Amino acid sequence: MAQQANVGELLAMLDSPMLGVRDDVTAVFKENLNSDRGPMLVNTLVDYYLETSSQPALHILTTLQEPHDKHLLDRINEYVGKAATRLSILSLLGHVIRLQPSWKHKLSQAPLLPSLLKCLKMDTDVVVLTTGVLVLITMLPMIPQSGKQHLLDFFDIFGRLSSWCLKKPGHVAEVYLVHLHASVYALFHRLYGMYPCNFVSFLRSHYSMKENLETFEEVVKPMMEHVRIHPELVTGSKDHELDPRRWKRLETHDVVIECAKISLDPTEASYEDGYSVSHQISARFPHRSADVTTSPYADTQNSYGCATSTPYSTSRLMLLNMPGQLPQTLSSPSTRLITEPPQATLWSPSMVCGMTTPPTSPGNVPPDLSHPYSKVFGTTAGGKGTPLGTPATSPPPAPLCHSDDYVHISLPQATVTPPRKEERMDSARPCLHRQHHLLNDRGSEEPPGSKGSVTLSDLPGFLGDLASEEDSIEKDKEEAAISRELSEITTAEAEPVVPRGGFDSPFYRDSLPGSQRKTHSAASSSQGASVNPEPLHSSLDKLGPDTPKQAFTPIDLPCGSADESPAGDRECQTSLETSIFTPSPCKIPPPTRVGFGSGQPPPYDHLFEVALPKTAHHFVIRKTEELLKKAKGNTEEDGVPSTSPMEVLDRLIQQGADAHSKELNKLPLPSKSVDWTHFGGSPPSDEIRTLRDQLLLLHNQLLYERFKRQQHALRNRRLLRKVIKAAALEEHNAAMKDQLKLQEKDIQMWKVSLQKEQARYNQLQEQRDTMVTKLHSQIRQLQHDREEFYNQSQELQTKLEDCRNMIAELRIELKKANNKVCHTELLLSQVSQKLSNSESVQQQMEFLNRQLLVLGEVNELYLEQLQNKHSDTTKEVEMMKAAYRKELEKNRSHVLQQTQRLDTSQKRILELESHLAKKDHLLLEQKKYLEDVKLQARGQLQAAESRYEAQKRITQVFELEILDLYGRLEKDGLLKKLEEEKAEAAEAAEERLDCCNDGCSDSMVGHNEEASGHNGETKTPRPSSARGSSGSRGGGGSSSSSSELSTPEKPPHQRAGPFSSRWETTMGEASASIPTTVGSLPSSKSFLGMKARELFRNKSESQCDEDGMTSSLSESLKTELGKDLGVEAKIPLNLDGPHPSPPTPDSVGQLHIMDYNETHHEHS
């Protein structure tokens, strides 16, 4: 809501009378549009414009950029569908597209175009239809490719509106149809120029029906009389003219010019590409003037005798002078005004209506407008001057006003100064003879001595060389003679041709009824005295020798009547008859005209004045008399071409201006603002609305004319640039020709020097030949010497190769010897390692033998104690036996598993040995391959092998050193543990001996106490022992890391699996609880002895066979063997004694670890 309120405040400030505030608000709107991409702001501006017709809002909307173009087109499309806002929104659309925004190509795909076409098909409001048609005509050159989708819609609109021009509905005012007819005429030109094949096909099919035949005869056929045959009708086809590739090379102004080229109507036609109007045409038509006291040569600029087209119009020349004063640019005899040939200039309605305040314009106004225009063309002060460049090569004028401004400067009525002498009019050049005459208060004419003329002569550089001075003087005399002959002729006014009726006939004839002539004559009689009418000579001027050849059929002007204006005709009447032929923006005093009928001289007429100058003079006089007779006698018999709808519109505007000025003249001067209606009082509302609609239609038509003029100016600027480039290229070519001449001179000089050099070269060649023969003989001698030296070098080379081969063989033998030495060193190190392992095994074996002796003594001691026990312990013994049996079964299963593991380990050993053999074989092959490679690599491989052997020896020494250190650490730890266990066992034995002296009752009590105590003692170190065993196994990874590096076998605890770990746990606990001070060595025939030997032998053999086993692995095997032997020593202890003695408390305390429940708990 705050944003909407802010936008409302900005809109209120948009039409502020303060220019600074208005500019700031406009800048804020543009910034918001750049930052906000939503449609809200655009919709608000469109609504505001429709409500207020604000010009700042219109300026913002016409300068919108992407992506707001879609929002604008959508909003316009929305309002086009509403009848109340259709007219104003179409006017907004016209303003937008006339500026040709960068997104104009999107119009063909926007939904607005179908809506516009639908509106033109369905709407019945003439103002809306006329505005829409002008918008469509303006839009078509921008989106020519849209014809492929909407071509039939364009044709339907033309058919509908052309029928309206004839069969008008009852609710439509007749005056509106003039504007509609002019719009339909422009649409006809656009469709015929862009799509001729399809359009002619439509006309053929549509107007072949009987109901449309009258429309064709009255409306369409007169339009077709004003166009040429389009070249596409001969060379093109329907599909070709709709092909998008046809339009890719054309811009908007190119399309407009292409459409104008095929028009014969001077208001629509273009005179480019070598086309020039024939000099005879202007003799058939009247020329307009602005005052009755004119000189007979005041309107020579209206002749069609000029051939080339300048890129700008005199209507854009602004003369800065005050009323009542004659500007220096007009009075100076050395001044030449920039002008345009009449075929490129149009009569402006603002000249007739008296509009002195045209709309403002954007564009840059040149700072200096009062300088003489002769400076632009480089003319001199006297008579005829040669400009520096043709109008085609002169720079384009800066836009003095807005493109729709029709500059009008009212000159005060003062005394006329007739021309000082007859100036030659060369119809092949764009010349302008202007005499600006000032009328005095009485309207009298000054004496002829004060005549002055201003001449603009174009440079004929692109047309040919100038005629000689004598020919020019002779032609001036002939021209003066013709002018004097014509000045003696007085003509009477011919009877006018009465038209069919009012505006119901769109193409009525050129002349007006006699009553209208009389009315205009009476109305103009109060403005000044009349002068004797003098005919114009410019239309019969001779064509120069450099007249360009006509490229097209000349344009037949639409008002070629034989009527004459009476001597007292006022300005508006003369302008009414020749409305489209006055190029000047100023009101110039008009001459009375002489019509020469519709007859034309033959096209070869101008050749006579070149070949036979004197004969041509008499021929022109005779031809003039014949034309005058024909004009007097056969005025009504001549067929007058139909009037263009544009001229009809111009005449309507002129008649409105006449009526307005007539009513104002009836009123006294102080009351010019009084209501001008015929009956007095306020005009009716319908008349006000009609006038407002007419004003709107006229404004739309002027905007369309502005658009056309913009396109022509753009085209002219392009052509001007091309002409400037052509002139520059010609100058460049001339400079290149001069350079070519200089270079040819240089070439001649170089040729002479070349001959001298060739002679010198021949001498040098002879000298060179003699020198070459001498050098050849020397070369042959040197080649012979070189061959001898080459043979000697070959012999030395062969000797060198033999020496190199011997050295290579000796190096190979040396490498083999080194390999053998390294191999023997490796074998020696392995043997030394095995020897050290065997020594450590022997030491372990001695230690185990000692342990076995100790355990045997302990066993005998236990047997004696059991024999000495009472017989009351039978139940306990039975339970223990049962437990021992179960434990024996478990141990047997463990033994079986151990044997299975042993078998698998043996198989694994065999597999590893086979792998080792394969590896040895591969190593041998690789050694052979390496030897071959060494032969090729030579020095580099030898150095690499030496480094490799040295590194290998170092790593072997380091590994042996590391393994030795790990073995020492493990031995030291094991010895310390054994010493601690021996000390504990000795203390326990002494305690048990003390307890044996007590009684039976005391022994039972002590037995229970010690059992509980030993349970606590054995349970407490159990976690530590478990931690120690697991730590030795887990941390044994660190101690046995070297063995893992040297052999691929897994550690013993990883190979054994869960059974081995459980076995080691139980054995570790059992060995920890068994005293080591008592017992004897088991016999070799007992189960324990055999099992111990088998295990020891297997372990030792596998340890000796595995080359990669280290000392840490041997130590781990020793500890496991000790544990196994400790457990197996207990098993036959219980089995060999079939008559156990009653256990002592010490024995009970020592055997509690074998309890079934406890062992079962530990295994679980």
Curated annotation (Swiss-Prot):
Annotated crosslink Glycyl lysine isopeptide (Lys-Gly) (interchain with G-Cter in ubiquitin) location: 30
InterPro entries (alphabetical): Hamartin
Outcome (variant: residue 632 to R): Moderate reduction of PELI1-induced ubiquitination
Impact noted for substituting residue 941 to A: Abolished interaction with TBC1D7
Result for mutant: residue 883 to T: In TSC1; uncertain significance; no effect on expression; no effect on subcellular localization; no effect on inhibition of TORC1 signaling
Impact upon substituting residue 362 to S: In TSC1; uncertain significance; no effect on expression; no effect on subcellular localization; no effect on inhibition of TORC1 signaling
Location of this chain's protein in the cell: Lysosome membrane; Cytoplasm, Cytosol
Outcome when changing residue 133 to I: In TSC1; uncertain significance; no effect on expression; no effect on subcellular localization; no effect on inhibition of TORC1 signaling
Name of the protein in question: Hamartin
Species of origin: Homo sapiens (Human)
